[in-house]
C-alpha cells in the first residue's frame, strides 16, 4: 500500500457507490475511515456496521484534526464546507479517482472501461478470479450479489485488483492497469469532454497506458473501439462475433433459456467449449467473452472460468428480478438510449410472447438535451411506455427540457407512450394497465429504484 502508517481518511459523500467501495477497502486494509453524507441509506448503514464513522450532513466539524486526507467525488461542490475546512487545516484534498489510482499503483491492476457494461464485466471478472482463488481487491460500481457488496478485500496479500475505470470525468487516465478492457464507446459525458473526438482521444490514451508486458481487450463489435485499435501502440486482443477476432463467440451457438444464456467461445479458432451465464442479452455475451479472455490471459483454468460464470449471481440494478408471479418485475440502471435499447431487446428475445411495460425516469437535463433524438428507437421493443420527469442529479433545469419531450420523440416509433410527470404517480397507473403475464421493467439511474422496490413489496403483500 502507499503508506506504512495507517492514517485517518475522510470521505465526503461516502454513501456513493464508488466512494463507499474505496472506503470499504481502505477500512479493510487498516486505515481509520470517517465520512459524511446527506442521508442515512442501506449503504451508509453497512459502512457503519463495519466500523466506519459516518456523519449525516456536511459540516466543518466533521473534519477532525487528525484527518490526514480528504477524498471527494466530482458530485461534491468545491464550496462544500468540509472541503473549505480541510484546506484551512492544510489537509490534503484528493479526488476519488486519485485515491483509486493509489490503491492500484502497487498491484496487478485490471481496469474495465467503456460507456456501457463496465459494472457487469467488472463483476464477472471478479467472480472468475475469486472462484479461481486469486482473491483480488475489487472496486465495483454496483452491489455484486456473490460478494453481497460493491467491494472486496478478503486477502490483504493479494497482488490483484479489479476495478471499473470511470471515464465520466477523465479520472480513468489516473489508473495504471496491467490489463484493461474497453467494452464500447458511446456519445456520453460530453459535458466533460466537450466533443466526441476528445472522448475518443481519452480512450486511446487509456488503451495505451498499459505497460509493455500488459494488454488490452477491445470489443470489435463497437466500430469506434475497432477504429481506435488502429492507433494502439500496446498489445491488444480483439473480441466479438467474428472468426477474425482473437476471442469470439459463434452467434449460432447462442441460446437463451431465461434467465440463463448458453454460448460457445473460441480463442484463435480453438474451441473453448460451451459456457453458461445467468444473464440475458447479446451485450452480456460480449461482457462474458471479455471476462473469459482476461481469465485465460491470467492463466486461469477453463473449468474455473466456466464455473465462475455459471455461479455468478448478478449485480445490483442490472436487470434485477424483483417479483415473479402473475407478472414479472425487473429493475435496471439503463438510462442512456443505447442501454435502454439493449436491455429491452434482451427482455424481448428472452420472453418473446409477453407484453412489456417500460417505465423510464430520465437522468439529468444536460444528458436529455444532448441525447434527445437518440431516444426515438430506444423503446421499440416495449408494448407500453411510461416516462416521468427528469431526475436532476443536482443539475438546474434547462428551459424546454423535460420528460414530455422524450415522449414526443418516442411517439415517432411507438404510439403507446404516456407522460406521468411525478414518478410517485406511476404505481396507480401500473395497477390500472397491468395484466397477468406482463413484464414490467423500470429503467433509470435516479431514484426510480425506490419506486420499483415499493411496487415489488406491494405485489408481494397482495
Swiss-Prot record:
This is UDP-N-acetylmuramate--L-alanine ligase. It is found in: Cytoplasm. NCBIfam families: murC. It comes from Brachyspira hyodysenteriae (strain ATCC 49526 / WA1). GO terms for biological process: cell division; cell wall organization; peptidoglycan biosynthetic process; regulation of cell shape. Cell wall formation. It catalyses: UDP-N-acetyl-alpha-D-muramate + L-alanine + ATP = UDP-N-acetyl-alpha-D-muramoyl-L-alanine + ADP + phosphate + H(+). The lineage of its organism: Bacteria, Pseudomonadati, Spirochaetota, Spirochaetia, Brachyspirales. Its main location: cytoplasm.
